[in-house]
Design a protein with these regions (language model features):
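Domain-scale activation on soluble regions of proteins
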Residues: 1-345
Length: 345
């Protein structure tokens, strides 16, 4: 990160997510290679879901693992440590839970040590996939920590775990996912389009979800009702449960300010289209469905067009969020003035 605080605090989350997702794909590829019965593979995937420890356990029951005793022992410890923190594969995708922050608030995640350990785990998966040693991402070091979370005693070049009492936790994720997707799309020319298309599209899909969910947390008079907030805030359904519940607040404040609301209908159609393609937020995460059928077989994808399409949806959500921040400030000022007026009388 060259000690860039934005990258250290914000890019760290999407980067770690992509490595974790790469490990999940690698272990699932191993399972597909070790088992010929389609229904058995499907059942393992359904039972284990995103749990890397369980998936690796299922893989080792089906084959002789090509690892040394040290590599095997280290890997099992690392996966167990990872799953204690991120069993659902959402730790790096959404704002940190209050319980986690209660334990780790104001601490620093050691980016280098955590990255080296996850790279080593990925390298072990590559060895199981029988990728030649010279082409693997990392070589094994028995002295490397098998702890998933590793902490530093300073913030220089590390990730600061901090959230203000009034914050909703979305800012660093939105910025991190947005800039990471832009970096992959615009600057990583050494990576082929085929290799980076799914990471970019998933980053953008998650970014749009974050943009919609962030509006749920706005404490404004005509915001999302509390019962809807409690029941829908963790949904992955972009159109049905996220957009449809933030549209009324967008429309209300746009009308109140005399703005043209026709763009709201345009964005709604775009979100509907994206939801038809990726209803549950997994179409860009996995190459196949649970029935093991390829989702994008022999399809020529215009990455630039899709990137701009998805970025436009997020830009609209981001603009709405800025407006709602201004509304929240104005409403807060009005409440204070009214309170002072009542006190005067």
């Amino acid at each position: 990160t060259n000690h860039d605080n934005i990258k250290s605090d914000m890019w760290f989350f999407p980067t770690m997510y992509l490595f974790r997702q790469g490990m999940e794909l690698g272990i699932k590829a191993l399972i597909c290679g070790a088992i010929s019965e389609k229904r058995k593979i499907q059942q393992i995937f359904l039972d284990c879901k995103h749990d890397l420890y369980m998936l690796f356990d299922a893989y080792e029951r089906e084959t002789v693992i090509l690892l040394t005793e040290e590599e095997y022992g280290w890997m099992k410890k690392y996966l167990h440590s990872l799953e204690e923190v991120d069993a659902k594969s959402d730790f790096f995708r959404f704002p940190l839970e209050d319980e986690f922050l209660l334990n780790y608030q104001n601490k620093f995640l050691d980016i280098v040590d955590m990255a080296n350990s996850i790279l080593q785990a990925y390298g072990i998966i590559q060895k199981c996939l029988e990728i030649p040693e010279e082409n693997r991402i990392d070589r094994f070091d028995a002295m490397r920590s098998s702890d998933f979370l590793q902490f530093a005693n300073h913030g220089f070049g590390n990730c600061y775990l901090w959230e203000s009492i009034t914050g909703d936790g979305f800012h660093k994720l939105v910025l991190g996912y947005s800039q990471s997707a832009e970096f992959l799309f615009c600057e990583c020319d050494e990576i082929s389009k085929e290799e980076k298309v799914f990471p970019i599209l998933f980053l953008l899909r998650n970014l749009i979800e974050l943009g919609l969910k962030r509006m749920f947390y706005k404490t404004i008079e005509h915001g999302v009702p509390q019962n809807v907030f409690r029941s829908k805030r963790k949904s992955h359904l972009l159109y049905k449960e996220l957009w449809k519940n933030v549209r009324p607040m967008i429309e209300y404040y746009a009308n109140a300010q005399g703005q043209d609301i026709s763009i709201i209908n345009i964005v709604e159609k775009q979100i509907q289209e994206l939801s038809c393609i990726d209803k549950n937020g997994d179409i860009f995460r996995y190459p196949t469905s649970y029935s093991l059928e390829y989702r994008f077989d022999n399809i020529d994808l215009d990455l630039k067009n899709v990137y701009e399409f998805m970025q436009a949806i997020f830009n609209f959500c981001d603009g709405c969020d800025c407006e709602f921040e201004s509304v929240a400030d104005w409403e807060s000022d009005m409440m204070q003035e009214m309170a002072q007026y009542q006190d005067w009388y």
